[in-house]
Amino acid sequence: MLYEFLKNFPQRMKNVGLYAVLIQNSMQKTSWKQFGFAKFDEQMNLIFAVMLYIMEQSLKEENCTMDDIGAYIDTINSRYLHKEISYEDSRKLGDFIVNVILSNEGRAMYFDGYDFDQNDYHIMHISYVANRIVYLDQEVRRTSYYLTDDGYNLILSTLEIENNMKLTIHEMIFQMHLEKQSYDKAVDEIKNVFNLMRIQIGRAHV
């Protein structure tokens, strides 16, 4: 390979694709305006708030039906967002987010990442949520939603992975500077490692 830093490029682009496909799906939809979410920032905030709720329900091993999602949106709207929408609108909004934006109305989603080893694009499948049939009170049949591995990777990359990997990332950068013989930058990076260690030790003693 001509450039070693382009190794495993499709894997990098898969992570980029998780954001790109989601943004593309959302920006192309005009239905947001009927719910009062005209700004792109508002739309993305609500999408991720809904994904976090689905993740929370999954982690607690509790059902996550469209009624649950609608009630959740209605609650955060009443308390925080203050859009002029009813509970029924909140439920429709939840259905729109989960089944249209996150699920692409049942159509498969893909993102292409170029493989510089094979001189060709890799077509990578992307899926944020999945569902299963559950029975409430052993009789009522409902669809319950949960995050896929891609969904977890996307959500966790927004905060949890960064928080837990800060020290490791700085160690990786330090190693990369050494490999490139950028010794001055390596010294700066090891200082960052020590600073993070001091912060973590300080928190442990609080």
What are these regions (language model features)?
Residues Y3-S31, K92-E160:
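Charged low-complexity interaction tracts in eukaryotic proteins
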Residues S58, N77-Y80, E105:
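Eukaryotic basic, amphipathic alpha-helical target segments in cytosolic regions
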Residues M66, E84-R91:
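Short, glycine/acidic-rich hinge or "gate" loops at secondary-structure transitions
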Residues V129-H205:
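Extended alpha-helical scaffolds
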